[in-house]
Swiss-Prot record:
InterPro entries: Ribosomal_bL17 (IPR000456), Ribosomal_bL17_CS (IPR047859), Ribosomal_bL17_sf (IPR036373). It comes from the Bacteria. The keyword Ribonucleoprotein applies. GO terms for biological process: translation. Belongs to the bacterial ribosomal protein bL17 family. The gene is rplQ. One of its GO terms (cellular component) is cytosolic large ribosomal subunit. This is Large ribosomal subunit protein bL17. GO terms for molecular function: structural constituent of ribosome.
């Protein structure tokens, strides 16, 4: 399997990919370097495919990769309680149902201007 090293050790690289994949699930669009965007695309496509399957095993596989971060939080005045949605819940309840008729190609990479400090090629990766 071919992949990009991204100038990091394997554990650091996996952590970066997990973080960026979780951020993309939560925000649905992020700005990063082109190389990272192309690597994130692979992991996000796999997570959405797991979300489309929707069974317990798929949910556990996705939970092993996606970070346990809060995607949204709301306050109910009647019960005086906060309710929150995690990135995994958002993946399975909001994002995956959008793509039931689509076979792959869930993300779009748009190239933008180079980063100011080091002229690294930047890109916006977003869910279609």
């Amino acid at each position: 399997m071919a992949y990009r090293k991204l100038g990091r050790t394997s554990s650091q690289r996996k952590a970066v990919l997990r973080d960026l994949t979780t951020d993309l699930i939560i925000n649905e669009a992020i700005v990063t370097t082109e190389a990272r965007a192309k690597e994130i695309r692979k992991t996000v496509e796999k997570m959405i495919t797991l979300g489309k399957r929707g069974d317990l095993h798929a949910r556990r596989q996705a939970a092993a990769f996606v970070r346990n971060e809060i995607a949204s939080e709301s306050y109910d005045e009647a019960t005086d309680k906060y309710t929150s949605t995690t990135a995994l819940q958002k993946l399975f309840s909001e994002i995956a149902p959008r793509y039931t008729e689509r076979n792959g190609g869930y993300t779009r990479i748009l190239k933008t201007e180079p980063r100011r400090g080091d002229a690294a090629p930047m890109a916006i990766i977003e869910l279609v």
